[in-house]
Structure formats: C-alpha cells, structure tokens
Amino acid sequence: MGIFTSKPEPAKTVKAAAGGNAGATQINNFYAYVEGDQRARFMQVPTLSRARDLMASVIGCLPLVMFKEMWNGDEMEKVPEAPRSWLRRIDKGVTNNFILSWTFDDLLFYGSAYWFVTERSSDGYPMNFTRLPAAMITLQDQQSAVRFGPSKQILFNGLPIDYKDVIQFMSPVQGLIYTGYTSINTALKLEQARNRNSLSTMPATTLRQVGGEPMSAQELSDMAAAYDHARLNSATCAVNEFVEVIPNTATPDKMLLIDAAEYQSKEIARLANVPAYLVSVSIGNYSYVSSSEASRDLYTFGVKPYIDCIQETLSADNVLPRGTGVMFDIESYLENQYQDSAENMPDMANEVNNA
C-alpha cells in the first residue's frame, strides 16, 4: 500500500542562468549584423573617417607575438615564446588585419569590443575567435556609457550569451558616440550649409535702380541682359544716375565657409585624439620632419591606448596560461618599416619654406 501513500517529489525549478547561450545561435548570421546608425552618421565626417582609417591601418598591420615573463636576476624580462595557432589566424574566416581593425573600430566608437570563443583547445584555452559587433551587444548590468568592469549579463542581438565565452575589450577612452555628438552634429550641419552654398548661383554684379520711374520686371531683365552682353565686348560700362552697379563681394572661401570648416576639422582631430596635421588640417607654422616622426606621433597620441587595451586583454588568464602574454610588434612599425623612408625623405619644413 506504500505505493499509494508516498508523496510525489516536488518538481525541480531551474533558475534561468544569466549566462544563457541562446545568443550564440545568432553568430555568423550576417543578415542580422549591423554596425549602428550612430557610427554610420559619424563616419560621414571626412576628418573623423581619415583619423579612424589612419589608426586602424596601424593596428591592422601589426603582427602579434607571444612572450613569457622571466626573472633574469635584475628585472622581469619578456622572453619570446612559441605562438599559439590563433595568433596567426585569430578568426579562421577572416584575416588578422580585418578582425583587429574592426576591433579597434568598436573600441573607438563604442568604447568596448567583443570576441566570441568558437573553439577551445584540449587545455581549455581559446583557439579560435569571431568578432561580435559592439552595436549588437547589450550589457544588462551596465547601462551607462562608462564601463565599470567585465559584464556577466550580455545580450547579443537581444538574446543572452554566455559571458565566459566572450572576450571583453574595455577601452580606457570613452567611445566617440558618447562624447562626440555635439561636435559631429556641428560638422554635419556645417557640411550641409556648404553643400547648399555650392549649389547657389550668386550674380557677379547687381544693378539697382535708385531713382526715376520704377522699372517693370521685364525692363529690369532687359537691362541686366544688355549689361551682360556689353561685358562680352568691353570691360568698361556706363550707366546713368538712376542705376547703381553693386559688385558681389561673396568669395569662394566665404561661400564654402572655409574658416569654419577648418576650425571644425581641428575639433574633430581633438575628439579623435590624433595630431591635427595628420588629418590634413592647417595648424600654422608647425610641421613634422619625416614620416617616421609622424608615425611616432600617431602611435603615441592616437593608437597606443587601443593597442595596450587589445594586447593586455589577450594576455589575460581567460585567454592564455598565466605567465604568458601577447603583444604587438610595435618596434618593427616605428623603427624598421620606416627607417629607409625617414632617411630619404627631404625636410618637410624646408620644402614649405622654399615653396
């Protein structure tokens, strides 16, 4: 009879895990991938597009090397280490140049970038990644524009994804879409004004009647046509006391708002943290000496924070065994690659003075 008197076991309740992985089904569904309307709007500004491309070209061309830290008796020394397979091909579907450049792009505009671990080796460490566009990521536990640490509640395309399989790059510089709205909005409105002015046909001369019987519209049109016809045959004109000739003082620099556009380009260079001269903005008498020095300026003032962010994130314990790390071979970019061009390039300041 015990079979009829035993109490049924209560149903087990399964708590929804914050790191659910339903979002992984959206990975590589490129039909749904987006880069964000704000980013697309920002990239319409030529100065910002130039700054972005310059910095992306640096990060995209740098090779990654692996090292191990060892004590040599005086200090910690970085000793070259045999690279893991993914260093040569981070994502098997694309080149390192591509994934690193677009990782930087996410850091620049959104302040964060994300890779998803698609494969792991037998020791549990990642061996292949794919990039998740930052515009498709939502952090449920961090809703502000400033990151406070790695998130454990990540949505990809609206679906939860396991944070343990997501490598989170957190930029030390706040994303442009959060800091540059006003400057970009001004630049776009200025560009719209310049476009309108470029389409307007301003007359070179205005004939204004200042006395006598008012002329009809047809008579005014005939007088203007006669004036234009006379200019084809002679540079001299004669008018009576009832007509005033007013030359148009509008010049191309005023019509196209050259000074305003130049100033706004400097503002965008400041926003992107790149030296203004690298984005072809006039800055008075300042000029660089060689392409090598320009490369150093671009690295020091613009690229270095993002390079450090990427290489330190990829050296973390969730990517590599403790004691090993990866870094960009920046010396080959700063010294070897541009050594010949630095020696052969003439002094830019002398060229300007001799022009």
Predicted features along the sequence, with ranges:
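Structured, contiguous alpha/beta core segments that scaffold functional sites
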Residues: M1-L257, A261-Y263, E267, Q339-A355
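Long, compositionally biased
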Residues: S295-I330
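Flexible loop/turn segments at secondary-structure boundaries
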Residues: V245-P247, N285-Y288, N336
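Short acidic alpha-helical/loop segments enriched in Asp/Glu that coordinate divalent cations
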Residues: T236-V239, A276-S287, A316-L320
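Charged substrate- and nucleic-acid-binding regions of tRNA-handling and nucleotidyl-transfer enzymes
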Residues: D317-A355
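An amphipathic, hydrophobic-aromatic interaction surface with interspersed Lys/Arg
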Residues: R270-A272, C309
